[in-house]
């Protein structure tokens, strides 16, 4: 017996804000369905013959021309917010709470450049149960070994075959009748990287800023922290907070602490690639990550930070980018 949320039929919208709102509704309804099912599962509910599944929202665009809407200029003069040719393009979406501004901008540009409507609906791509948990949910840890093993029979777990980088690497070839990709990263790939960023940097992805520095020199990190703390002492600083591993938040002088600040605790030891975030209100601040030694770390962290779509990143240190 399959347990699924009420199906949300696809709708066609020419208003970017309305399209984003529909994405938010589908995602929130489906994630909350999974969270409630998980609470029931942890509480000992009978799932002997049950299979629980909820899927990501999708956005789809149909276009019949490579030309821009209302213009004779080709889209190859644009850097983003367009598709390269006629056809059907779609992608799955996740975390509209984190990506809302980004999605809204992309929806607006797609409609401005191609006209028509955006189709928003429920995809067939399952949301892995681990990707539905809220930031500080740790419900799985309360399960015994047998119940934890039974999870895979009830819920969808992360599937690495759905998280490859074929689109971003330019090697993805749609099968006959399949839509072209509308984004570099699918929803499961994004969710996977958001989870890994928590693990590698010791900070939540919500803290990351749009300008990123990487280094393998601790003295750069020390100076960055010193600079951040100095900025927090200035009531008129353009920066509003600095966040360190363990989600430890220091707010600018004159700003009140927020409830989420109480959840931060300095870890007993630093994570593999500790992250530090000097934040502006519009996310145009600076994130700095100590990638440590070795080219594998550099590739790993950039693979994951890429899903945040930062404006720029820069490596500091003569061997930091090998």
Question: Where do the model's predicted regions map?
Answer:
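Accessory terminal and edge-of-domain segments that mediate assembly/interaction
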Residues: 1-312, 320-322
């Amino acid at each position: 017996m399959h347990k699924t949320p009420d199906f949300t039929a696809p709708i066609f919208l020419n208003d970017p804000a309305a399209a984003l709102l529909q994405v938010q509704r589908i995602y929130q309804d489906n994630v909350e369905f999974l969270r409630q099912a998980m609470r029931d599962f942890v509480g000992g509910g009978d799932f002997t013959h049950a299979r629980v599944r909820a899927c990501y929202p999708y956005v789809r665009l149909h276009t019949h021309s490579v030309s821009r809407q209302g213009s004779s200029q080709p889209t190859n003069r644009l850097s983003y917010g367009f598709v390269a040719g006629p056809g059907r393009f779609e992608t799955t979406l996740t975390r509209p709470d984190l990506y809302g501004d980004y999605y809204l901008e992309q929806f607006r540009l797609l409609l401005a450049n191609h006209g028509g409507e955006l189709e928003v609906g429920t995809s067939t791509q399952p949301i892995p149960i681990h990707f539905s948990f809220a930031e500080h949910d740790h419900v799985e840890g309360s399960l015994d070994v047998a119940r934890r093993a039974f999870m895979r029979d009830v819920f969808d777990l992360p599937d690495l075959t759905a998280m490859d980088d074929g689109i971003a690497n330019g090697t993805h070839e749609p099968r006959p009748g399949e839509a072209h990709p509308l984004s570099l990263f699918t929803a499961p790939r994004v969710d996977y990287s958001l989870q890994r960023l928590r693990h590698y940097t010791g900070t939540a992805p919500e803290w990351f800023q749009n300008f990123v520095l990487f280094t393998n020199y601790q003295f750069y990190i020390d100076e960055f922290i010193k600079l951040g703390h100095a900025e927090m002492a200035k009531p008129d600083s353009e920066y509003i907070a600095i966040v360190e591993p363990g989600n430890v938040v220091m707010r600018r002088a004159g700003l009140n602490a927020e409830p989420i600040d109480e959840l931060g605790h300095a870890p007993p030891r630093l994570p593999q690639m500790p992250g530090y975030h000097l934040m502006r209100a519009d996310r145009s601040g600076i994130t700095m990550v100590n990638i440590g030694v070795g080219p594998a770390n550099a590739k790993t962290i950039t693979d994951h930070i890429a899903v945040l779509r930062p404006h720029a990143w820069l490596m500091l240190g003569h061997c930091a980018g090998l």
